[in-house]
From Swiss-Prot:
The gene is ndhI. One of its GO terms (cellular component) is chloroplast thylakoid membrane. NDH is composed of at least 16 different subunits, 5 of which are encoded in the nucleus. PROSITE patterns: 4FE4S_FER_1, 4FE4S_FER_2. This is NAD(P)H-quinone oxidoreductase subunit I, chloroplastic. It comes from Oenothera elata subsp. hookeri (Hooker's evening primrose). Its cofactor is [4Fe-4S] cluster.
Amino acid sequence: MFPMVTGFMNYGQQTVRAARYIGQGFMITLSHANRLPVTIQYPYEKLITSERFRGRIHFEFDKCIACEVCVRVCPIDLPVVDWKLETGVRKKRLLNYSIDFGVCIFCGNCVEYCPTNCLSMTEEYELSTYDRHELNYNQIALGRLPMSVIDDYTIRTILNSAQIK
């Protein structure tokens, strides 16, 4: 008779332990139910990037003095700077400036060390194309400012990134 009682006691203990495990899992599920979703509907919703975001590089042709500091500090010698020395003025004149974003690692050294601040990082991160040759931007393409995510009325922006966590 005693083995039967101990069997019922073991069964009762196992039932209580199983109920406790199920309850713990249920509490975790309930704690996750109150959180906001992590993902966003990308083409229609966009996150506003931080101020220090390293996006596409913006270039101002008029400020550049063709010193080639950006080429020297770039770890992959990426910016191509074509210039001509004007002998009468003894000054460099910039002819062409281009960056291939298919190779760029967006380290930001060129922007940081530019003495005239003619380079800056934008919030544009949509650089994907079907042809990699389209990623080679010249001074005209680099000079275009991207449309701000905040100004685009077709896109709903997620202002506070803390809500997404």
